[in-house]
Amino acid sequence: MTGTAEFDSFADSYDRDLAEALAASGEDRRYFAEGRVKWLGGILQRMGMKPRRVMDYGCGTGSTSTLLLEKLEAEAVVGVDLSLRSLDVARKNNSSDRIQFSPIEKYTASGSVDLAYCNGVFHHIPPAKRSEALRFIHRSLRAGGLFSFWENNPWNPGARHVMAHCAFDRDAVTLSPPEAKRLVRSEGFTVLRTDFLFIFPRFLRLARPAEKLISKLPLGAQYQILCEKTD
């Protein structure tokens, strides 16, 4: 991730800034967060996997950490981030003793995590430092652990619009799905599947049930690469 100071400056306005950027979609951030976690949960259920310990990498203010705990029925969630101010906000907003928040530099990556989740973080990490971030995630996972890697799809005009109008995304460097797959494979992950979500904005919401049928097409505003730690 980028420097601590950058996201410290957005910690208190993060929700408002994101809401303004997402306004064109007709939905709020919770809609997208719940959609990602629900999609992931369905896949895990079909795989027969119930992760006990989950990492929320780049957790920010912690809103998704709560969803991961509740929707995936995890025993514990640890959210890690560079921004100390964002972590302070996360602690204030999350009272469960099953969720902990830690600065990345103070977290020991010990191979105890069953599932690592990361959304919209890597486009903030300078390309030269992305491998280092992936190695941290790899070390954090147990053998056979899964990595749910979500990113904004630069091929989707809606995603580009949101990023162009989001205060903390304007200097982001996006990753195409092929770039992201090459990156995770280079750091010892095996790609299990790639899915594209959030194709239809709210005014076309009646078409949303069809998204499951076309989730392999690179149309959605976000994509997930689900990977396994295999070496």
What are these regions (language model features)?
Residues 63-106:
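Class I SAM-dependent methyltransferase SAM/SAH-binding core
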Residues 117:
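A conserved beta-strand element that flanks and buttresses the S-adenosyl-L-methionine
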Residues 153-170:
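Short, glycine-/aromatic-enriched active-site segment of Class I SAM-dependent methyltransferases
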